Amino acid sequence: MKKKQKFIAPIYGLKKTPKQSIKLDKSILIRAVDLLTEEHKYLEKFGLKGSYDAVLEVNYEYDSDNPSEPFPGLFINLINKIDASLVVYGDGVVGVAGVAPAPKEEFSGGGILSSSARPRYEEKLDKEIDENFASYYKKFVIAYDMRPVAFDVYRRSCDRFSNNDRTIDSCTVLESLFVPLGERSKKSFILNGLNILMFSTDEIKTIDDIVEYRNAIIHADRKRQLKLLTGSKYTYKWFEDVFKLIRRILYKYVDNPWS
């Protein structure tokens, strides 16, 4: 049986509260947390205790006879996509903290905490959420539907700490974007894809280097890893710059997707 349910999902990592409500589509709205109704205290009942500046308001339609609805279906069908759109939109620690039924909604399933991130001010998203985000989101949905693995792997990778783990994730993202299924010459397709997106020679060389480092990891070539890491290139800052470059590649793909 078809059923509609309203949920709210707080967003962490915004430097500013949205000045006005932003409609992403007919069923999704981003708005400020309602302080008059003490919405922040309501969210705390579901373990969502962060200092949030905005929430997603979602009118979710689902089949109540399906055991995977509304959870985890809501995440698989919608929340993960919006979460990915936020982390690709700009540099910073940002995302959807969890989901709770909207106040006064009749729902017995409770809520879900998906992230307990508490970014410092300087770590927060370097862009405002406004009408520009709404325009970007429309394009993002098209790109996400074409390359869901690339965006979901990047989204999950943002919560990881090991440079080796994030390096493997980054190369998985690039392969998902640029390499045809079953193709073995992966690096050449990746570098050619970056050329098509008009990245600079230096940026393409950086991706070449991270692919080489990933190859040393997955082939358990410890000698090669140590040789690379003892040089002057593979510093903490270098890895951080590479991971930011991966985000920019995804952002540019949103502007210019191809199948």
Q: What does each model-identified segment do?
A:
Residues 107-117, 128, 167, 201-209, ...:
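Charge-enriched, short contiguous segments at helix-coil
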Residues 1-165, 243-244, 249-253, 257:
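Charged, non-catalytic interaction/linker regions at domain boundaries
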Residues 154-158, 195-197, 227-232:
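Glycine- and acidic
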Residues 72, 133, 187-191, 203, ...:
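Short amphipathic alpha-helical segments that mediate assembly, nucleic-acid/protein binding
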Residues 166-204:
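Flexible secondary-structure boundary motifs
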Residues 79, 165, 171, 210-211:
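Residue-level recognition of hydrophobic positions within alpha-helical transmembrane segments
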